């Protein structure tokens, strides 16, 4: 049970604390605060939260082209005629797309891998959307692939693997500049730092 509430907390409350505690970035104390806030809140607020979660699960899908989250397929970025279809920025997660869009620097398309290569965690290239990326590169007029994986061991390993696969196709491959701290995640970078990393990208 959650955070030592086995005997003093009613089971429905303890179960919800457990569920919040399973979410990334939410520890036992934060989970408890959220649940006890909802206990004090009006019923309508709890219902709105529950309905929003279910609506998100029911209506959100992955774009069949770039694998970003969307409510329509293909997504609005892939169907935007003003985007530069000759550039593709490869990221690990949908949150990285949000971070890069906030910079206002990138006007091309995206490809979301949904993870990074990590032998320790048992994540291999075939577990990611790499096969789909290579298929896109063979049929779309892409001239540059910007590898925007996180600046950590897993991100670097993924970028190196992708570069080995893509360069023989005759496509330019670049990597974000090292303005980002080692071990950080793109989603937490501020817009200025991320924008400069994009502008200063280097050849691989």
From Swiss-Prot:
Its transmembrane ranges are none
Cysteine disulfide partners in this protein: none
Q: Which GO terms describe its biological process?
A: DNA recombination; DNA repair
User: Mind telling me which PROSITE patterns this protein's record contains?
Assistant: RECR (PS01300), TOPRIM (PS50880)
Task: Offer an example of a GO molecular function term for this protein.
Answer: zinc ion binding
Q: What are the alphabetically sorted keywords of the record?
A: DNA damage, DNA recombination, DNA repair, Metal-binding, Zinc, Zinc-finger
The record's annotation in CDD domains points to:
TOPRIM_recR
List the InterPro entries: DNA_Rcmb_RecR (IPR000093), Rcmb_RecR (IPR023627), Rcmb_RecR_Znf (IPR015967), TOPRIM_dom (IPR006171), TOPRIM_RecR (IPR034137)
Q: Where is the Toprim domain?
A: 86-181
Q: Zinc finger (C4-type) residue ranges?
A: 63-78
Instruction: Tell me which SUPFAM superfamilies the record gives.
Output: Recombination protein RecR
Name the family. Belongs to the RecR family.
Q: Please describe what this protein does.
A: May play a role in DNA repair. It seems to be involved in an RecBC-independent recombinational process of DNA repair. It may act with RecF and RecO.
Q: List the protein's name.
A: Recombination protein RecR
Q: Name the gene for this chain.
A: recR
């Amino acid at each position: 049970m959650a955070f030592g509430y086995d005997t003093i907390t009613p089971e429905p409350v303890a179960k919800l604390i457990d569920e919040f505690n399973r979410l990334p970035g939410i520890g036992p104390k934060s989970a408890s605060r959220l649940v006890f806030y909802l206990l004090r809140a009006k019923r309508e607020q709890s219902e709105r939260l529950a309905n929003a979660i279910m609506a998100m699960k029911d209506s959100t899908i992955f774009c069949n082209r770039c694998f970003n989250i969307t409510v329509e397929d293909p997504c609005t970025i892939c169907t935007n005629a003003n985007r530069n279809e000759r550039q593709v920025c490869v990221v690990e997660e949908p949150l990285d797309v949000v971070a890069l869009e906030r910079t206002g620097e990138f006007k091309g398309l995206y490809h979301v891998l949904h993870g990074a290569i990590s032998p320790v965690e048992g994540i291999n290239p075939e577990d990611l959307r790499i096969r789909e990326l290579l298929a896109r590169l063979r049929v779309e007029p892409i001239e540059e692939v910007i590898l925007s994986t996180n600046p950590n061991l897993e991100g670097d390993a993924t970028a190196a693997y992708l570069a080995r696969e893509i360069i023989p196709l005759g496509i330019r491959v670049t990597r974000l500049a090292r303005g980002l701290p080692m071990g950080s995640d793109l989603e937490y970078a501020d817009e200025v730092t991320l924008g400069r990393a994009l502008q200063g990208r280097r050849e691989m």
